[in-house]
Amino acid sequence: LVVALGEHVYLRLQDKAPIGLGHCVIEPIEHVPSHVEAAEEVATEARNFQKCLVRMFAARGAQLVFLEQHLRLGSAGLPSRDTMAIECIPLPARDAAAAPGYFKKAILECDEEWSQHKKIYDTGGCVRGTVPAGFSYFAVSFALQAGYAHVVENEAEW
């Protein structure tokens, strides 16, 4: 179900196993591999949708967690996750304060001990400019104020 339509992106309800009430997804109208690789106008419009959602859920006493997972097309013979999709998940304010700690711990524990890239990057709330284009990654943002990214080196184990 499409909730809002912009010039470059749209907002829809999550129809495949939503995590909770209000779980929605921001996706581009035309194919874009990831938020990192999106044209400036697509990224700006997606960010504006995120800002509106943050304000809307804050008025209801909830905070948003934004997630994006980008796996390179055909890497390791796996099905692709090669289209930008920003998951928007509202959390009650009492739970949202603990979310950054849980995500940081999970990211730090998720990959091999010896990897080529840093295990975790502080994104400051936006993955663009943190992860280079063409890399597989997982990113999480907390109400656009803070966030983390992780470069996925082994997609088969991710």
Q: What do these predicted regions represent?
A:
Residues 1-158:
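HIT superfamily nucleotide-processing domains
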